[in-house]
From Swiss-Prot:
The protein's name in its UniProt record: Putative uncharacterized protein ycf15
UniProt keyword Chloroplast present: yes
UniProt family annotation: Belongs to the ycf15 family.
Lineage, highest ranks first: Eukaryota, Viridiplantae, Streptophyta, Embryophyta, Tracheophyta
Subcellular location: Plastid, Chloroplast
Length: 49
């Protein structure tokens, strides 16, 4: 039972971590572009996902 529990937990961590890193980098890039620059580019000021 212990071995059965450890394997899915490890798979969950391995699959989730790169997604979190990708989303945080995407957030950093979006927030580096200021709202005024987004308005000039014609992009929506609100962040949509």
């Amino acid at each position: 039972m212990y071995g059965w529990y450890e394997l899915p937990k490890q798979e969950f961590l391995n699959s989730e971590q790169p997604v979190q890193i990708f989303t945080t980098k995407k957030y950093q890039i979006l927030f580096r572009i200021g709202p005024e620059r987004r308005r000039k580019a014609g992009m929506p000021t609100g962040v949509y996902y």
